[in-house]
Amino acid sequence: MSSNEYAIVVENVSKCYQIYDNPRDRLKQFIVPKFEAALNRERRNFYNEFWALKDVNFEVKKGEAAGIIGRNGSGKSTLLQIITGTLTPTTGTIATHGRIAALLELGSGFNPEFTGRENIYLNGAVLGLNKNEIDNKFDAIAGFADIGTHLEQPVKTYSSGMMVRLAFAVQVQLEPDILIVDEALAVGDALFQKRCFRQIEKLTSNGVTLLFVSHDQESVRTLTNRSLLLDRGKQVMTGLSSEVLLEYRRLLHDEENKFYSNLASEIAEKTQNEKNIATDNELPIVSITSSENEESTANENLRSDKLSFGEGEA
C-alpha cells in the first residue's frame, strides 16, 4: 500500500479500556500480578474489559472526503483520537501522511488562560508553522472567526459558539493536508455552519483530505464520498456514503423498534402488577353481603315477635 496514495490507513485497530469496580481493585491490579508472576502462578485480573473499538480497518485516499457515522458510543471519537495521536490503540496500526488539523472536542488544543491571539500562534506552532507564516495568515483567521475584540481576551471567557469559531478558523486557514472535523460544529449557529461547509468544500476541491464526523446525515451525504459505519465499537460497513447512510437508517429503525417493544412490555408488566395488587386488596364482598342478610333477617324476626306480643295482651 503506497504512502503516495493514502492519507490515512487504519489496520486492525482495537481499543480496550480497563474498568474497575472500585479503587481497591485498581491497587490490587498494580500489586498482585507481580507477586503471582514471581511465584509462577496464574495471573488474575481485577478489572473488566470494555472494547471501545474492535478490529477496525479503514483507508482514506489523499484528496478524498470520507465520513464516519454511528450512534453515540459507537467509537467514532475514539477512532479520531487514535488517528490524531492523542490516544494509542491497544492493537493494530495507524499511518497518516501529511499535516493534520483536527477540530475535535470543544476547546481541545487551546490554552484557556491564553488570549485568542496567543492561541492562534500556539496552534500554528503545533502545526509546524513559524511566526512569519502565522503572521501572514493572522488576518484571514481573525476575519473568518469574526469575534471582534474578544480575540484579545482569554479563551476561558468565550462562549461555546465563539470558541468553535476561532478553532475552526485556525484549523482551516493554516492549510492542513488532512482536516478532521468532529461534531464540535454543531454548537455553532446555522449561518456559521454554512460558512464552514463552504470552506470545507473549497479545501477538498484543492486536494485537502477530509475526515468528517456528524449526526447530520445530509451534511455527510453532501460533503463526503465514502463513509465508515460504526456500531458499539465494531465496523458495520464501509462504502459509498449514500449506501452507508441507508444502512445507518436501518440500524436506527431497528433500535427504535426494539426500544418501543421493550417499553410496551414494561408498561404491560407494570399494568398487570397493578391489577394483581388491586385484586389482592379487594374486600370479601360475599361475606359482607351474607352478614348483612343475616342481620336483616334477625331484625325482621324481632319485629315479628314484638307484634305477636302486642296482640296477646290485647
Describe the function of each predicted region:
Residues 215-222:
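Conserved H-loop
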